[in-house]
Every structure is written in structure tokens, then in C-alpha cells.
Amino acid sequence: MLREPVGLFFTLIFPPLLVAILGTIFGNDPTPQFDGKGFVDATLPAMSSLVVAIMGILILPATQLQLRESGALARLRATPLKSWTYVAADVTVHFLVGMTGVVLALIVGMLMFDVRAQGSVLLVLVAGACGLIAFLALGYTLAAVYPSAAAATGIGNGVMIVLMITSGAFIPMEALPSGVRHATQFSPLRHLVELMQGL
């Protein structure tokens, strides 16, 4: 993964950049729309949760399939390296990179927009870590289902757009049609956003 600049961009640069851009556009002055909180105050945990989803839906499946298509995984099987050692190392790398992206997004919000923590930052990080573990498991499942890295990227981008729009991170759930709101009950990102916003 460390050799994939696109993956690193979307996990380490895109989230804090998104916080900076949206925070600059909408500001962080308290508004009734967010119950007296600023835009960044209200949405920062949700925006940081996007790192978790991007890692599981986009980055991990594409990375695994690229390794499979290049023959790297087959060559690894021919070495004395145990399978569980590779899996443990791969999970660890993706987990650490994902959590770094979450932390960077939070730091940008706190430093640039003076975000006032509504609860425990530690709990937000714990929730992000639990969500990341779940999304990594989903990512490995998708990697086993997708036929190719190109399919993983194409389908993953479409899925991510839908998940972002219906997560409640940017568009209030009340603004969505009732049928869409009902369907989002099955969205893992919506539940992660609600968890992190509530901490």
C-alpha cells in the first residue's frame, strides 16, 4: 500500500484537505442549523469517518487485487512466509494508515477552525478504530468477490459516492426521502457517522 500514491492521497491527504476546504467555505460560526454549533464542530467526526470507509471500500480491495493480478501473492506463497504473518502485517499497515488519516483530519479541524470538542476525543478515536476494523473486514470480503482491480476501483467509487451522500455526514438525514432514509439503515457508514457524531 505504501507504494500506492493514490491510496495514500485518499487516506492521508484527502480527509484533512476536505476538512480545510469545507471549513473555509462554510466557516465554523455557531448556527441554529447545527444546534448552536459551527459547521466544522458538527461535522468533523463524520468527515474523519470517511477515511475509514475509503480504506475499506476503495483502497484495501484494489490493493489486494493488484497484488493478486501481479502475481505477488502467488510468489509469497512459494516462500517460507506463513500466511497469517502476511495477513497480520497487511491488516496492521492498513489500520495504522487509516487511523493516521482520522487523526490528521481531527488535527486540521482543531488547529484551523478551533473545533470545540463536544465529548471525549479518545472515544472518537476508539469508535474510529472499531469502525476501521469492521471496514477492513468488509474490504477483504470485497477483494475476494471482485473479479479485478479495475472492477474494485470502479464499483468502489460508485459505492463510496452513495454511502457519502446517504451517511448523514454532509446532508441531514431529515432532508432525504423517507425511502432512502429507510434504506440507509443498512449502510455501515451511516451508523459509524452517527456513532462518531454522538461522542
Q: Each predicted region: which residue ranges?
A:
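Transmembrane helix segments
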Residues: 13, 21-29, 146-186, 190
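Hydrophobic alpha-helical transmembrane segments of polytopic membrane proteins
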Residues: 123-146, 164-167
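Short helix-to-coil transition segments within interhelical loops
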Residues: 75-84, 145
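Alpha-helical transmembrane segments of multipass membrane proteins
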Residues: 20, 106-111, 129, 140-141, ...
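A residue-level signal for alpha-helical anchor/packing sites in multi-pass solute transporters
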Residues: 63, 106-107, 141, 191, ...
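Transmembrane helix-boundary elements of multi-pass transport/secretion proteins
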Residues: 1-73, 84, 89-102, 109, ...
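Helix-to-coil boundary motifs at intracellular loop junctions of multi-pass secondary transporters
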Residues: 67, 111, 144-145, 199
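Hydrophobic alpha-helical segments of integral membrane proteins
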Residues: 1, 5, 72, 179-199
